[in-house]
């Protein structure tokens, strides 16, 4: 029964935030229910106004006499009931006190409320009911369809989601939204809250907020209507206290109580809300996420609720916010909302699944949705009567909420006798009944009256604007939805940014350490360069490396930005700050992190290598390096901000980085650039920096000559005028090369460009900064589609192809075709009846937390018998899942004691395989279909002795039994594009049943987060399995009384893993109730939910206290003694049973290793085929960069610079390596997490089969990619022309292809080796990048073995790229004549009286140079090389070593594979030894 409003508002804790400027005074609690209700009761408007005035007067008198007058709770904490940090804190008293103070000065604290009315509300989207799955072969058809859609010729179908909704919610009221998943609950809430991203509203839609239009509310007053989604997204590095303090500060009003600073206000509000929601103990705990340990899941949910609460919106839309909370905490949350609405006049619209009667009774109104139709709107207390009068029946103990939702499920609604042909059946019939009802007519009249009372643009809007304006800080625009000014937003985001930095220093520290190591390595390679012409190339290479590493230091910022983007978008919707304010602050926050990285790296690099050691030149070097880092940081951030998904950003970014590298001006000098790509050099900021660094190093400097031409025997006494220095820019007769001339001749660089370039760089910096800030403010992430099923092409069932205009993308296939329960039982006969009994005694489980032993389970006893369904319940954190994991033998750490026996015998290796474990998370391979997932489980987990045909037949039985025929061919996909929540849960159960478990099934929270109908269907399914001989142990929280009736026994745990009860439940749970009542608990009320009553009895419900220690009561009870006795008896009797023969000879696994390998390999091949985005991203990296490199180095001549360019073209081809590695790692990690979390504990297959299949699947694809990479790179550069002189064009072409193939295979196996033992792909990518850089530095291109210090020679030998580059260069250019370009020809005047031939013949013969004009007697022209082999010898490459190198490369590939398997075993395979030792100890 619903409590009267006054009682309800004072029942339990008053636990919700009050915005001091939101809502009417406290009297709202005593005002009448609604306009509609009053008119219905015959009270006229005039009379109502009088009653309201009277109530307000009485309320004010009661406040004045409350004894809290004048006490400011923000400053005065003398009253412990007003101090949120006190145990005696009373939130109701705090609320009353605050409202009393603010109501005395209505001018300073104007109030605002926002009720809502809606008429003709129609929302729709575009899409299809079912889509076909993209594969490598059919993705082109999708692309064609997308192009047609782009030009307006697509077959986009309008899908109506909400149809003709009508209703109104007054300020101070609460509306509950009921409907099954897919009925449009979320869409309705989003529409009211203005979150229509990807949705459209019909033109006639009329939504008003007490005189404010929909458009104005969601622009000027954005953040005043809030939508709180199901998901929890927060910065994991922040503590819960800091997260909430940020929200409190962002919405802290300007019109605070006198003497209260903004910080005092925010801190106090934060403390109050945390106290109200029971979060005070998490104040200094990190929020965390899946990867970072932090608060628990339920606490994280409450942090989200607290954040929304602190924003103080007058209208709040809560979407399934109780998901993951136990029933008592969920009730407490709804009561808190009730208090907020009663005291402050705020309005709450709440979609809730599995609403208990106590929760339902808190609400004023209810709206019931059925596949996008409204079938009821009105008072919550009248809804049940409305449908019972229609002809439906509500079973005893079924909650009103469950009854209303069950009406929308054909299999679950019950019709009263005699009404079978009178009740509506389809959604349209229900909607028609509602439209023709008297209740609707009354509702329309009430909406009319509501809108007349609050006309658009009337006084209510003025009042609202005034209240909002009073809160805003100075310098805030009148039309701005934000409370703070722009500068204050930046300051606030800055504070949070530094807290995030402090919370996770690992990234900064690892970057500083990593860059320092890299600087030391590079500096040691180029250690103390001499100041002769020999160091020219080395200095250029060093500066090239330095500027690239500075430029690309910020590339990973793209990833960080994408991780925080959903959080920033959420806060923007809450109107906490501009996204651009966060963008600016994140740039500033990163500066202190960038500074140490930059200083350490550049200092080491500059001074160790003997670059120009003067303060001025170092300053110029550092200035350009830092400016380049900042410019490129903005460019990468801009790319991330512009792209609407991370995948969209990755391939373009890597190609963009490669373009920047090539067109910096070192790998291909400006004079050699082809006109079609020359422009890329102009728009490359790094090119300007590189030019300035070269000018800074070489300009105004003379380098002594290291080698003269001619030199050697006979030339020692030749005059200097007849010699020339060997190098570009040399002049005969000079014993040095002038730096300025070298820059001009070799690079076309001029000293006058030094500061011009800095100006251009600043231009790039400013432009990219503005572009990033603008993009971050304007570009939104991609909206998700509505829920649709995806099928393999050609297998879309006929019913799914028909897209009706009524179809609902939230769940188009809400299955009206569900069969009646009795028809399904025919298929259950296939289930194997279990005979074994699983029993355990005195089970304890201890783990170490921060060096302290902590007991998770404390002497737990129990058993599960075939044909029984046992519930495992407990308070949050009681160790329910831990007990399930310990019993299922899935624990890999900690100390376990006690006995866990099957028929009196210890569990053997096959135990995990013989049990099914239905996990809470529905983890499945996204690309597989439902049938394939079941077949995979059946093939691997059923005994090898069972024929394949029999296994497949059993899968069909499972599909029928679980009613999955309609979507058996559907692809699992991701939520929204694939199976919905219920279908996923059924598949999770199906996968375990398909394995034919011999012993029992464990279920972990199978109903968590489901609506009551889905929860009921899952419980009915478990009951059905049990009735056919299965044994099931199932953890459950938030169960309704009806759900609990499905269970036979209960094991209840209190905090610390102590048993409170283990035994039968009895009919209507009488046995359980009797146990507690006999032991002195209060009586259970007749209509109460016994599960919730029990939580209150043992003190687990918030606000309840136990009058005795119930675990102690159990310990000394007669019932426990009986349990102990029965366990002892079982142990003795069951041992007498004959032991069944072993069904499989493979112990741990059902199938032999070779069979496991082939089944796994088939699945991963299928997965890759169905991931066209991955395969085509790989193809793009193997086509676009090679093609680009090919056309950049188009038809290189065999000049000295030409050969160097060809060498760099190989070097640049290697640069695609890290991108290919990065692409592969997330796919491996996805497969691995599925294996480790679900398939390994189930003993489906061995880790060896998993690893080998994951390595082998990559090889064919990479071999295929070698083909385009080879053709796009080898032929445009023209390397094949070098084979003409030796007449080996075909042979060398084939060998080159082999080398490209080896490179691709090496890439593939190297990726597997790097990710094998490492958790996160990002970490593995970073380590792979470091190792790649090392291989590249020591491969002999940037620094030849002659230049390398002796210490590093071993690295040159160890680097696989040394052999790869050596082989590719040898095959590409060996044996061809060299033709010097004009700037490479040396001009030497012969001594008087000698011609060129006579003077230089001895030298050219000895040095194998070419004399171009032997007969001339002046200006002798010498090309210092005659064949390409001389160039190769200079970098220690011999053609004769080609096949030795190929052999060594194959050894590397084998090594990578073996290392991948070994590392996986070493790091990730649980070692049983550790656990056994722990047990012994």
Swiss-Prot record:
Disulfide linkage: none
Effect of loss of the gene: Does not significantly affect miconazole susceptibility.
Regions crossing the membrane: 507-527, 542-562, 587-607, 616-636, 650-670, 758-778, 1174-1194, 1210-1230, 1249-1269, 1298-1318, 1327-1347, 1358-1378, 1446-1466
Glycosylation sites: 19, 76, 320, 530, 1395
The keyword Transport belongs to this UniProt entry's keyword annotation: yes
Region (Disordered): 1-45, 61-89
Keywords: ATP-binding, Cell membrane, Glycoprotein, Membrane, Nucleotide-binding, Repeat, Transmembrane, Transmembrane helix, Transport
GO terms assigned for molecular function: ABC-type transporter activity; ATP binding; ATP hydrolysis activity
Residue intervals of the ABC transporter domain: 134-396, 838-1081
Binding positions for ATP per the UniProt entry: 874-881
Expression induction or repression: Expression is slightly up-regulated in the presence of miconazole.
Principal location: membrane
Biased composition (Basic and acidic residues): 1-10
Membrane topology: Multi-pass membrane protein
Protein's job: Pleiotropic ABC efflux transporter involved in the basal level of azole susceptibility.
PANTHER family reported for this sequence: ATP-BINDING CASSETTE TRANSPORTER (PTHR19241)
Family membership: Belongs to the ABC transporter superfamily. ABCG family. PDR (TC 3.A.1.205) subfamily.
Protein known as: ABC multidrug transporter atrH
Gene name linked to the record: atrH
